Amino acid sequence: MNVDYLFSTVQTMSRDYILTEFEEDRFDCIIIDETHKAGDESYHKIINHFKPKLLLGMTASPERTDGFDIYKLFGHNIASEIRLQDALEDDLLCPFHYFGISDLVIDGKEIDEKTEFRYLANEQRVEHIIEQTEYFGYSGNRVKGLIFCSRKEEAKALSDAFNYRGYNTVALSGDDSQEKREEAIERLEMECEVDNCGRPIIKSEVVKHNQPLDYIFTVDIFNEGVDIPQVNQVIMLRPTQSAIIFVQQLGRGLRKADNKEYVVILDFIGNYSNNFLIPIALSGDRTYNKDNVRKYVREGSRLLPGCSTIHFDEITKKKIFASIDRMTTTKKMLTEKYMQVKFKIGRIPTIIDFYKLGEIDPMLFINYAKTYDNFQRVVDKDYTVVFTEKEEQILAFISSLIIDGKRPHELLMLKMMLDGKSVAIDSFAKELVSIGEKFKEADYNSAVRMMSLEFVAGADANKFAQIELLSKLDLKSGLLKRSIAFLDKLNNTKFREEISNLLDYGMMRYKDMYANHDENNLVLYGKYSRKDVCRLMNWDKDESSTMYGYRIKHGTCPIFVTYEKKDDISESTKYEDQFINQKTFSWLTRSNVAIDNRESQEIINYKNSGLKIVLFIKKSDGEGTDFYYMGEVVPKSWMQKTIKNNKGKELPIMNFIFELEHSVREDIYEYLTN
């Protein structure tokens, strides 16, 4: 076959009688599309047969979930990589307007993964879908839509229901021939005259299979490998099982075409367990960090490049936030994400690799396995490093209490000691200033208490009781030096490297997330636990286990509010803490606190004592242990009230009206109060 360019399907080229027609060096360049499928035998046959000068693979979804290393086939050389957000920013795709719409509640039942078929094709649901498709519309002279369903019978029944109401649609699945699919695509893209409602004017002499289509209903096809530029409306009637598949289905409408300014994406969201995958897919955020995912639901359009928009209705937001709260990091998911990075870079990844590549948040490995190397040892047979029990304890201490980057002081101290330096207070101050931090003796002393484990309490104190990082003898003289035991451990090169990687990762987190802090060492709207607040506000000891709603100590009064309280808590703790507006917050003390109580008087007379009152809020206990930092507050008015305990007895309680230093940002305010 004497041609310069040869195009072939994999199925054809992999046939023995065709493949053997070509010598191994017949082609200078071989380009394989849909390369993520290259783990299949037919692809292997082709790749192993030829020896081109250039083998190039192209795919929109390189991440496989079956453990096959696609990158290895190409020597781990990534020529170019562009994600959805990059393509939108570079104007390579058609802008989209995404609307997350609550699916219908039928007979008191929400649509979910287990919903019976009779509800999926219910007349009420059909009317709801049609009403929304007509309301949100499309760009162009008529609708040309793809509708993704969860089941074949659902697709067929909905197609019949649409046709009964005057639409022209077909249902397709993997059971249908390629010819039937191509014919349907041609009919969907067909240009024709339309009436005032944008509906095709069908001439009586045109046979049905030549008439233009309004919609194609599909189940397990059209996710990939099909190009229909004219699609101007994509409707999703199925749960999101994978962020990859979501983007593939979204992408069916993102091709540019004449007379198409944008594509409308309608996502009918039921009570699905995987709803958290929707913001992950739309944002392209691969960290699986819950706060990042929540932020995208709150601020989606603001974070998208170009003129694309994202909107969730209020019921849908609630469903997605609830799904995010339930989101768990399983061993399977963590292993999958770990292996994807390992395959991508062609070696055992360090903790820094995940952060630099914008992949899964490395703190999830630590939360799951206590240390990153513990996780590696469990899931990666190529990882053969083994540390002693004491070394593991030190790594666990650094991983759980220091590397989150919420303060650089401990990271810097350890790094200086790792480099062999004894740390004098003046040399530490210079290093601190070099990274843009002001030196404060209180912060320095607090960091020393953490490093010497004086700050640590409770379960942490028991867990790390055998660790000694600092020489106690030198500590008394004001000099920080490595203890003999720690120095001995650092002779292990692998151990030293592991600590160095952890510290570098911690400093990256600090610079990206926490460097822009206020004088309280806290970032406005950053997330902090009670333990974090004890440390960052320079308390002598971790008193988080007994802090509860608030505590006045060391000239500070951190207040922690759970905005949506559980129904099963005692009557005397059902405080009605709430925003009056974005600048004003109504807060109740614990019960049995009267106006003449010492706590009340300290808050009332905050100016005289210099008491700093700082407010932290989380929406519900489903968010975990961390609270949003809302900044400093000052009392503007107060009143003694009463609250009943479980026995009906009236107890005194103080109601303070606080003015916030910073008016609450709109998206945070809406999230907390709605």
Predicted region positions:
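Post-DEXD/H (motif II) to motif III coupling segment of the RecA-like Helicase ATP-binding lobe
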Residues: K37-H97
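Conserved interdomain linker/interface between the two RecA-like ATPase lobes of SF2 helicase motors
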Residues: I78-C149
